[in-house]
Amino acid sequence: MSGYRVISADSHIVEPPDLYENRIEPKFRDRAPRIERHRTRTGREYDAWYFEGVRVGTVGSVIQAGKRFEDPGSIDFLGLWEDVRKAAYEPHAMLEELEMDGVWGACLQPSQGLFWYRLSNSELLSALCRAYNGWIADFCQAAPDRLKGVGMLNVDDVDEGCQELERCADLGLAGVFIPVYPLPDRPYRHAMYDRLWWTAQDLAMPLLLHVATTRGGIPGCEFTLDFNQLTAAGLANSDYWIRYSLTAMIFAGVFDRFPRLLVGSVEHETAWVPHWLKQMDFTYRERPTLRSWKSRDGMLPSEYWRRNMFVEFMEDDYGIRLRDIIGVDNMLWGNDFPHAESTWPKSREFLDRIFAGTPDEDRRKITSDNARKLFRFSKESE
């Protein structure tokens, strides 16, 4: 791996307890989520985020980096703010822990913010996004060549979402989240999103669809504000939502109309992609009655994938074996620091294992070059 610097396309911060109270507009301050300390029935203390009296996530659910290598049985998603690694909220400490992992730079995404997409109050969700976007922009200013922030958009109101997207670009953010699945009555095939697609294309801002960011109220979706509703089946099949949304965009002709738009899957891993591409191409060719769109350029759905989409993953060795079908240029690796699934601090070992026998050029693209180009890291990262 000599000769280039590894970049994590998917790392996270952990939002400080006072982020929203300090950053949100005054009219929303009384309703801002807060961290409260409670005890379990056995007397163990833990911190959790609360919104209007309802628990909407524990601090411990996003701070378990490294435990899988020490004692995976101890991962119970309980914890105190004092347990959070300083690197998760302080940029210089972040750089130190990335270096410990053999990583030079990182694209930083929210942690608790993933849960906010499930809020029913759209106006408040937008305010939380604005508060976070300002904070993460300031965080990355400590090392703008090595830390790239990803903002959050609420796209319930497309015009409002486009305004915030423009602000994110002005703040220097490298991309933005949109819900992996929007409100149930307005999937991404709707023309109402065309201004969003145009704005993202015009600003060269990638749109990222992260696991567990479905909007609230979607029938059959177990990612709700009540974490107890999530079952093993719901988690293991979470890639359904990303497949549906990306397929809806392709078959609505979004990438015909916006050929430079870039949209990506985050943390759904990647081995599902080949079968999905095959199914889309089959449907396009063999089931024309199920589609109302015909490619302007005679392209198959799989060809739009290769031109307009990307996938971020952590340790999908099956995906590496299938890289020629998925597309080496479409794959980006991330260490998911500081979450329980993170490969930190053993990312180098994981990369050596999953890339065993893989050409060095492919490994470099997936672990460095693709992220550098997509998120505009400095030439120093080459």
Model regions: which residues?
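Short, well-structured secondary-structure segments
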Residues: 79-86, 103-120, 124, 144-152
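Catalytic pocket-lining loop regions of alpha/beta-barrel enzymes
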Residues: 140-148, 153, 157-159, 163-332
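Conserved residues at the C-terminal ends of beta-strands
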Residues: 15, 109, 179
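Mid-to-C-terminal alpha-helical segments outside catalytic/metal-binding sites
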Residues: 2-5, 16-85, 89-105, 134-142, ...
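Short acidic-aromatic active-site loops that bind/stabilize oxyanions
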Residues: 83-87, 125-126, 236-244
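Short glycine/proline-rich turn/loop motifs
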Residues: 69-85, 114-119, 228-235
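Charged helix-capping and loop-helix junction motifs
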Residues: 125, 129-132, 189-195
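Active-site metal-binding loops of divalent metal-dependent hydrolases
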Residues: 11-12, 336-337
